């Protein structure tokens, strides 16, 4: 047995020896501390805890586990690399390094929509997916803390059924509104300002800019990305949600208590956001 085979065998054993319960608890504990520090407006401590999380072995291992268990685990990015064996997965953990990291361009594909049109989907490499998932662990606690109360798309422990239930709750009373206005933000992911994201999303700014500006490859041609956050990346849904947070309050503030012909009027608007 040569050295490469020995190393692969060792890596396989080490992957199966990881205590995943301990890993989950470690990450969850740090996430709870991030939330506590954020609520107390100790933003320096938030950054320190985020750094600790994103540089920990357990968080990196969990990031690799997540991207090798989801639906896209058999779809490679531009480098053609997949992590299908236990050995490859354990070796991948050591690749998740902040120092010297440069994301590769996204692979652009198109998937059909119900209306017959096609939606662009950008596929990162396995390493980039894992890096985004790793930093998502550090960003998601803040995103969940600041999220609109009735936002249901791409949310932890929320689903389509929750959004439907909230709609039912808002509409099943005798004095409930009789009308529903459905809105759709055209090209939402594609048109978000990079500068707004960099300024307002509380995470590593340099890394965030690299992801936003890495470009995509289509028909073997590299195209730049000057606006938007790509559909298909692990961290984009959270960024999009954080961009839209505050919309519920802004809409409800328009319909505040007022007096009409000497009579107090309490207009009510129910809001449900789902992507």
Q: Model-found features: residue ranges?
A:
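Non-catalytic, well-ordered alpha-helical scaffold segments
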Residues: 28, 32, 44-47, 51, ...
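Short, conserved non-catalytic motifs in the polymerase core
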Residues: 71-84, 103-130, 146-159, 181-182, ...
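Cytochrome P450 catalytic domain signature, combining two hallmark sequence patches
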Residues: 102, 141-145, 203-209
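Charged boundary/loop elements
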Residues: 13-72, 137-153
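Conserved polymerase palm-domain catalytic core
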Residues: 95, 149-150, 162-275
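Phosphate/adenylate-binding "loop-and-lid" substructures adjacent to NTP/NAD/dNTP-binding pockets
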Residues: 46-118
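Intrinsically disordered, low-complexity and often Lys/Arg-enriched segments
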Residues: 1-21, 25, 261-263
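Anionic group-transfer/hydrolysis microenvironments
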Residues: 79, 138, 186
């Amino acid at each position: 047995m040569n050295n490469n085979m020995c190393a692969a065998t060792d890596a396989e054993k080490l992957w199966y020896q990881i205590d995943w319960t301990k890993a989950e608890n470690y990450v969850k504990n740090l996430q709870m501390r991030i939330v506590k520090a954020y609520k107390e407006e100790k933003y320096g401590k938030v950054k320190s805890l985020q750094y600790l999380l994103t540089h920990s072995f357990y968080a990196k291992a969990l990031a690799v586990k997540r991207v090798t268990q989801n639906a896209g685990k058999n779809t490679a990015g531009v480098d053609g690399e997949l992590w299908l064996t236990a050995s490859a997965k354990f070796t991948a953990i050591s690749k998740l390094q902040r120092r010297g990291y440069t994301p590769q361009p996204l692979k652009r594909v198109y998937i059909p929509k119900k209306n017959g049109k096609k939606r662009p989907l950008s596929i990162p490499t396995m390493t980039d997916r894992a890096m985004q998932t790793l930093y998502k662990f550090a960003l998601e606690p803040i995103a969940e803390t600041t999220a609109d109360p009735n936002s249901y798309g791409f949310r932890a422990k929320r689903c389509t059924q929750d959004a439907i239930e909230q709609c039912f709750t808002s509409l099943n009373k005798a004095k409930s509104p009789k009308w529903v206005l459905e809105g759709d933000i055209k090209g939402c992911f594609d048109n978000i300002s990079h500068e707004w994201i960099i300024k307002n999303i509380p995470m590593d700014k340099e890394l965030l800019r690299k992801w936003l500006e890495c470009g995509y490859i289509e028909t073997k041609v590299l195209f730049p990305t000057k606006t938007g956050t790509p559909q298909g990346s692990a961290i984009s849904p959270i960024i999009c949600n954080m961009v839209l947070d505050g919309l519920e309050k802004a809409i409800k503030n328009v319909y505040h208590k007022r007096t009409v012909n000497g009579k107090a009027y309490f207009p009510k608007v129910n809001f449900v956001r789902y992507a």
